[in-house]
């Protein structure tokens, strides 16, 4: 696979993770995932920023996006890229079920990664909303890649591309969310 195709495939594969991560901000609110509990260091386990509603709705949104990508592939839209993923999932057939599975893994992986990132930030004594470069951009990426790697092979080149692209996409998305008043900070 040439480098340009690999870049496009990497972005295509991550669409459910990217959209799930962003949608948690829209769907979020309600009960914090840590239920307000504190850790051994007398700081919140995760904090108010990661909620059950945002995590569940965002994860399901990622799954739906994966299903939509699978459905579009049945009509030839993005089918080249979807076939690369689908050909590796041998225990189930059909683009839509395969898309739902990949979307589920990427979507929930992204949001669990975000929760892990929040946990780490609290342990490192960073307050909610304070920037922690690279952790802020990559927590959701790393865990979503771990989850999806259970069904899809990821080359080292692909992982590097996803990490690099994700850093810039994440910063751009945060700036946009800040401009439309969905976030209090631009980073």
Swiss-Prot record:
Enzyme Commission (EC) number: 2.7.7.67
State the InterPro entries in the record: CarS (IPR032690), CarS_archaea (IPR002726)
Listed under GO biological process in this entry are: glycerophospholipid biosynthetic process
What enzyme class is recorded for this protein?
Answer: transferase
| The reaction(s) this protein catalyses | 2,3-bis-O-(geranylgeranyl)-sn-glycerol 1-phosphate + CTP + H(+) = CDP-2,3-bis-O-(geranylgeranyl)-sn-glycerol + diphosphate
Tell me the keywords, alphabetical order.
Cell membrane, Lipid biosynthesis, Lipid metabolism, Magnesium, Membrane, Phospholipid biosynthesis, Phospholipid metabolism, Transferase, Transmembrane, Transmembrane helix
Q: In which pathway does it act?
A: Membrane lipid metabolism; glycerophospholipid metabolism
Write down the superkingdom of origin: Archaea
Molecular function (Gene Ontology), one example: CDP-2,3-bis-(O-geranylgeranyl)-sn-glycerol synthase activity
Membrane topology recorded in Swiss-Prot or TrEMBL: Multi-pass membrane protein
Membrane-spanning residues: 7-27, 58-78, 100-120, 137-156, 167-187
Chief place of localization:
membrane
Question: Per the entry, which co-factors are needed?
Answer: Mg(2+)
Any single Gene Ontology cellular-component annotation: plasma membrane
Q: Where is it located?
A: Cell membrane
Protein's job: Catalyzes the formation of CDP-2,3-bis-(O-geranylgeranyl)-sn-glycerol (CDP-archaeol) from 2,3-bis-(O-geranylgeranyl)-sn-glycerol 1-phosphate (DGGGP) and CTP. This reaction is the third ether-bond-formation step in the biosynthesis of archaeal membrane lipids.
- Please name the NCBIfam families in this protein's record: PRK04032.1
Q: Which family does it belong to?
A: Belongs to the CDP-archaeol synthase family.
UniProt cross-references to HAMAP family, sorted A to Z = CDP_archaeol_synth (MF_01117)
Q: What is this protein called?
A: CDP-archaeol synthase
């Amino acid at each position: 696979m040439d480098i340009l195709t690999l870049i496009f495939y990497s972005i295509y594969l991550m669409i459910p993770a990217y959209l799930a991560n962003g949608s948690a901000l829209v769907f979020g609110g309600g009960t914090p995932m840590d239920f307000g509990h504190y850790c051994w260091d007398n700081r919140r386990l995760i904090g108010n920023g990661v909620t059950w509603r945002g995590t569940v709705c965002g994860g399901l949104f990622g799954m739906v996006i994966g299903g939509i990508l699978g459905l579009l592939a049945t009509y030839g839209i993005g089918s080249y890229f979807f076939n690369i993923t689908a050909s590796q999932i041998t225990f189930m057939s059909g683009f839509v079920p395969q898309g739902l599975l990949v979307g589920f893994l990427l979507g929930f992986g992204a949001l669990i990664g975000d929760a892990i990132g929040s946990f780490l930030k609290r342990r490192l004594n960073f307050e909610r909303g304070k920037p922690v470069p690279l952790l802020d951009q990559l927590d959701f990426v790393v865990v979503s890649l771990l989850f999806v790697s259970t069904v899809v092979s990821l080359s080292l080149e692909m992982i590097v591309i996803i990490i690099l692209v994700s850093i810039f996409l994440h910063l751009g998305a945060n700036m946009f969310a800040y401009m439309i008043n969905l976030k209090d900070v631009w980073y």
